[in-house]
Amino acid sequence: MMARRTLKAVLIDLSGTLHIEDTAVPGAQEALARLRQAPVAVKFVTNTTKECKRTLFERLRGLNFDLQQQEIFTSLTAARNLVEQKAVRPLLMVEDSALEDFTGLETSDPNAVVIGLAPDHFNYQTLNKAFQLILDGAPLIAIHKARYYKKKDGLALGPGPFVTGLEYATDTKATVVGKPEKGFFLEALRDLNCSPEEAVMIGDDARDDVGGAQNAGMLGILVKTGKYRPADEGKINPPPHLTCASFPEAVNYILDHLLGSK
């Protein structure tokens, strides 16, 4: 691993780290405001596929978070980029609220399958259509493969089990574009003019947020909010650089120990 350099960027997960549905993590807005005063770039990286970037931005602004829409990098964006690179016509297995981020793509007579979190579309008919397309040679593009995510009433199935089911049934492997893929983190850093060794990631998912970031060369800070479950930090190797109670505590650590100022 390359030597650590001066911290230049902080990547922050959204759902489970800054907010859970329409409720902010206590103290998160104030902590973000303090981080904004430090000499680091801030970017928000998310696997959220339930809604388009614009809706997500409006939700966060409604919770009084200080951010700009262009600071949000989503796995939907990464998926669209790959679809355009491959010049394919996707069957979009995403919620209707996320379709805005795919506006302009040709989707008639699909020859590829793009799957995200789509509870309203995870039925036999749609899954079987995807199954048949893949058997006919269509590539399977997974926006991400999270096992589950946090809702107010508990944990809920993520897209991962459905992606894995299609992989199993068709004896193929999906191309995954979201966290924890190394390429996702590198793409998120690209316009920040910094290397992974100059960045830290904060998130509630040990595998996808912290493990993925550290595999890309970043530091990873795991927070015990959102989908975190006891002993999650022991599920990745190397373990998180730091595990702390919540986002405000992670910001305190960054200001005190990685930047040396509060």
Swiss-Prot record:
Binding site for substrate: D13, L14, S15, T46, N47, K179
Residues binding Mg(2+), per UniProt: D13, S15, D204
SS bond list: none
Record carries keyword Cell cycle: no
InterPro entries given in the database record: HAD-like_sf, HAD-SF_hydro_IIA, HAD_sf, LHPP/HDHD2
Gene3D superfamilies, sorted: HAD superfamily/HAD-like
Listed cofactors: Mg(2+)
Record GO terms (molecular function): metal ion binding; phosphatase activity
UniProt keyword annotations, A-Z: Magnesium, Metal-binding
Cofactor: binding details: Binds 1 Mg(2+) ion per subunit.
Family: Belongs to the HAD-like hydrolase superfamily.
Name the UniProt record assigns to this protein: Haloacid dehalogenase-like hydrolase domain-containing protein 2
Organism: Danio rerio (Zebrafish)
Native organism taxonomy: Eukaryota, Metazoa, Chordata, Craniata, Vertebrata
Gene behind the chain: hdhd2
